Amino acid sequence: MNQIPMTLRGAEQLREELNYLKNVRRPEIIRNIAEAREYGDLKENAEYHAAREQQGFCEGRIQEIESKLSHAQIIDVTKLFPSGKVVFGVTVSVQNLNINEEQTYRIVGDDEANFKHNLISISSPIARGLIGKKKGDIVLIKTPRGEVKYQILKIEYL
């Protein structure tokens, strides 16, 4: 499996979720299964089957997070050499030349992306189009909504 780029904050969020799943959610589900078993016949015991389904989801998510963390390439953006180019983890301000509006994005890992908070995934069309470019560059990016022309205004290593 390839390394998965992730910011320090993204790795911390996954560790927090993993801790919650292992130390809170998993024991809670085990208690629910034990309680449901006390109701008797397991074939027609909806509570038991629901708890077992929750257990499957929980264990699957635990494995997924552990795999991501074991393959994570954790990047501390504040320690990157400011090359003046757009790279993973930077905050980049662009002018959308189609609508003449300034937008600011931070390029993060897939699990960290949240477009409402201007956190865009490294694998998104916008991030892929901006990676490697520098201040002043004009970039034409194909998005699901059509082509958008951006000019890079500022690159910050925050």
UniProtKB/Swiss-Prot annotation:
InterPro entries: GreA/GreB_C_sf, TF_GreA/GreB_CS, Tscrpt_elong_fac_GreA, Tscrpt_elong_fac_GreA/B, Tscrpt_elong_fac_GreA/B_C, Tscrpt_elong_fac_GreA/B_fam, Tscrpt_elong_fac_GreA/B_N, Tscrpt_elong_fac_GreA/B_N_sf
This protein's UniProt keywords: DNA-binding, Transcription, Transcription regulation
Entry's Gene Ontology BP terms: DNA-templated transcription elongation; regulation of DNA-templated transcription elongation
Pfam families in alphabetical order: GreA_GreB, GreA_GreB_N
UniProt-recorded Gene Ontology molecular function terms: DNA binding; RNA polymerase binding
NCBIfam families tied to this protein: greA, PRK00226.1-2, PRK00226.1-4, PRK00226.1-5
Function (record text): Necessary for efficient RNA polymerase transcription elongation past template-encoded arresting sites. The arresting sites in DNA have the property of trapping a certain fraction of elongating RNA polymerases that pass through, resulting in locked ternary complexes. Cleavage of the nascent transcript by cleavage factors such as GreA or GreB allows the resumption of elongation from the new 3'terminus. GreA releases sequences of 2 to 3 nucleotides.
PANTHER family: TRANSCRIPTION ELONGATION FACTOR GREA
Family under the similarity heading: Belongs to the GreA/GreB family.
Annotated protein name in UniProt: Transcription elongation factor GreA
